[in-house]
Every structure is written in structure tokens, then in C-alpha cells.
Swiss-Prot record:
Source organism per UniProt: Polynucleobacter asymbioticus (strain DSM 18221 / CIP 109841 / QLW-P1DMWA-1) (Polynucleobacter necessarius subsp. asymbioticus)
Binding site for Mg(2+) 2: 229-230
Residues annotated as binding anthranilate 1: 84, 115
Binding site for anthranilate 2: 170
Cellular component per GO, a single term: cytosol
Paired cysteines (S-S): none
Gene from which this protein is expressed: trpD
GO molecular function, one term: magnesium ion binding
InterPro entries: Anthranilate_Pribosyl_Tfrase, Glycosyl_Trfase_fam3, Glycosyl_Trfase_fam3_N_dom, Glycosyl_Trfase_fam3_N_dom_sf, Nuc_phospho_transferase
Cofactor remark from the record: Binds 2 magnesium ions per monomer.
Name the UniProt record assigns to this protein: Anthranilate phosphoribosyltransferase
One GO process term, biological-process aspect: L-tryptophan biosynthetic process
Binding site for 5-phospho-alpha-D-ribose 1-diphosphate: 84, 87-88, 92, 94-97, 112-120, 124
Gene3D superfamilies: Nucleoside phosphorylase/phosphoribosyltransferase catalytic domain, Transferase, Pyrimidine Nucleoside Phosphorylase, Chain C
Length: 341
């Protein structure tokens, strides 16, 4: 081993970075359950206190992928994930989940990776269950769903069994750790394209560079200036774009795409049932600000997936997919496929 857990802890306390092989060794000990819980807790807090680096996050993500149950997709063209870190405290309806079906209806192949609610009122898994989907699918069944329907959902606990060694420690700590930002980086289908929302402006550049280190093809990391971990309709959104191996950061605004602004708190829900109702209203072509924010995020997904040349074109395709009824058909096909497996 390159370093002991105690040495790694001391290094972090001194605000010194762990090298790639050192972080890899520590993460393998954590994921295998071989590191004492007290040391795991200490190391996670020390990493957070000194601020995790791009190299440390990338190494940790690679190890999580090693321990994950993979989903093998043969035709990987236009394969994309649309996901948020969560933890933004906005308690909105499931924007990225609605965008998943709209983007799939417009030609993207969605490999969505998500979980139940941690800090929100409704996680992606919660609203998909409310919509009638079966989440208890094997990796092979998810792969079939993605191949036949064009959209699949990988329920994180089904694909990351080693997380059982970490969950009790995270719950006891009750503070954010590196694991709060690892989920979106560890897609079991190894999608090389992603629209990722984050809970803090500082993470935009960091996560974009982590995705660069992980060999992603095209990524948009977004943070609404209002605090939303999606592209916001309230005002500007900070974007970190990875394309052709280069990261650049910029801002976008709803007005750039001819959309009216709307306050994020107008999208708040109390539970998964409320989220389901809004998702269905959007999918069923009821014009609203909710529909606009879904089309905005679906449009960005289509851009990242390589279906649209830019976000504006993606939004037009998203609106057309809803108006034609294709998005509703995609949702119904997804639910039926999940239940037939």
C-alpha cells in the first residue's frame, strides 16, 4: 500500500493533496469495508475540510466504478446521463426526470443514474415509482430497457452494493462529504456524455475537470445562480462545458433562448405525488413555466447527446417531442418495459 489511513489523515489535516495512487488505495479500503469506521469518518471530514481536489475526486470515482455493478450497452451512440448532485435545498419537482423522457423522445438514449430523496422532497427514484415504474431491475434488464425504449434508470443501491460499508458512517456524520459529489460521476452504464447539476458554484469548474480526467466526451456541469442544481429559469446559470477535451466556463440565461423567467420557488413540491402531477402535466403538453424549465434542460441534454447542434435547437426539439405526444409515449413505454422485466 502506498500510504496508511493514518498517514492519509495526517496529510489531509496538513492541507496536502493525496496522490492518485494514495487516494485509490484509501478508497478501495473504504469501499471494501477494510478501513475502521472511525478512520473512514476522520478521512472523509479531513478531505472535506481541506477541500477535495480534482485528482482526488477522479481517483475516488474510478474506484467506485470498479466496485459497481455495470450495465453493458452495445450501441452507445447518443448515450447520455442527466443527473444532479441534489442537496440544493430547492425542493423542486423532478426536472431532470421529466427531461429524461422528453430528451429520449427527441432521439437521445438516456442512461439515468439516481436514488431516492436524501435532502429533497422527491428524488428521481421516488417520482419514477409514483409514475408506476419498477426499480428492482437487474443490470441486464436495465440494458434491455435502454436498448429497446431509449431510456433506462439505474437505481443506485442496485448498482453500488459496496456503499453499504459507507452509508451508516455518512448518516452518523450528517455533513456533506466527497460521496455527495461522487454519485453523478459513477454512472454504471459508463455514459460518456452528461448534463450534471451541482449544489455549489465552486463545483462547476471542479466537476467539469473531473469529468475531463475521467475521459468524458461531452459534458455540461450547471449551477443556477439561484442555487438550483439544474439549468434555472429564474436567472443566470453558471456552466462548465467539457467538449473536445477542453473545459470552458460561461453563463447562460433563459432570455438567451426566448424563454420567460420564473422564480424557482414556483416549482416547489411537498412530495413525490405532487412532483408526479407536474411531470405528467409537462409531458401531456400543458403550457407552463414548468414545461419551459423541462424543455430548457432537455434541450441541453440533446445538445450534450449530439442530437442538437446547440441548446436552442435542443429546446425546439424538446418542445416538438412534447407537442407530438412522443414524450408521453416514451414515458408509457418506459413504465411498461420496467414492469414486464
Amino acid at each position: 500500500m502506498s500510504i496508511t489511513p493514518q498517514e492519509a489523515l495526517q496529510r489531509c489535516i496538513e492541507h496536502r493533496e493525496l496522490f492518485h495512487d494514495e487516494m485509490t488505495d484509501m478508497m478501495r479500503l473504504i469501499m471494501s469495508g477494510e478501513m475502521a469506521p472511525e478512520l473512514v469518518a476522520g478521512l472523509l471530514v479531513a478531505l472535506r475540510t481541506k477541500k477535495e481536489t480534482v485528482g482526488e475526486i477522479a481517483a475516488a470515482a474510478q474506484v467506485m466504478r470498479e466496485f459497481a455493478t455495470s450495465v453493458h450497452i452495445d450501441d452507445r451512440s447518443h448515450l447520455v446521463d442527466v443527473v444532479g448532485t441534489g442537496g440544493d435545498g430547492a425542493h423542486t419537482f423532478n426536472i431532470s426526470t421529466a427531461a429524461m423522457f422528453v430528451a429520449a423522445a427527441a432521439g437521445a438514449k438516456i442512461a439515468k443514474h439516481g436514488n431516492r430523496s436524501v435532502s429533497s422532497k422527491s428524488g428521481s427514484a421516488d417520482v419514477l415509482e409514483a409514475l408506476g415504474a419498477n426499480l428492482a431491475l437487474s443490470a441486464e434488464q436495465v440494458a434491455k430497457c435502454i436498448s429497446t425504449v431509449g431510456a433506462g434508470f439505474m437505481f443506485a443501491p442496485n448498482h453500488h452494493p459496496a456503499m453499504k460499508n459507507v452509508v451508516p458512517i455518512r448518516k452518523q456524520l450528517g455533513v456533506r462529504t466527497i460521496f455527495n459529489i461522487l454519485g453523478p460521476l459513477t454512472n454504471p452504464a459508463d455514459a460518456k456524455r452528461i448534463l450534471m447539476g451541482v449544489f455549489h458554484a465552486d463545483l462547476v469548474g471542479i466537476q467539469a475537470r473531473v469529468l475531463q480526467a475521467l475521459g468524458m466526451e461531452h459534458a455540461l456541469v450547471v449551477y443556477g445562480r439561484d442555487g438550483l442544481d439544474e439549468i434555472s429559469l429564474e436567472g443566470p446559470t453558471l456552466v462548465g462545458e467539457l467538449k473536445d477535451g477542453v473545459v470552458r466556463e460561461y453563463e447562460i440565461h433563459p432570455k438567451d433562448f426566448g424563454l420567460h423567467t420564473a422564480p424557482t420557488n414556483s416549482f416547489k413540491v411537498a412530495n413525490a405525488e405532487e412532483s408526479k402531477r407536474i411531470v405528467l402535466d409537462v409531458i401531456d403538453n400543458k403550457p407552463s413555466a414548468a414545461s419551459d424549465i423541462v424543455c430548457l434542460n432537455a434541450g441541453a441534454t440533446l445538445y450534450v447527446a449530439g442530437i442538437a447542434p446547440d441548446i436552442a435547437s435542443g429546446i425546439a426539439k424538446a418542445k416538438a417531442a412534447i407537442a407530438s405526444g412522443a414524450a408521453r409515449q416514451k414515458l408509457d413505454a418506459f413504465v411498461a418495459a420496467s414492469q414486464s422485466n
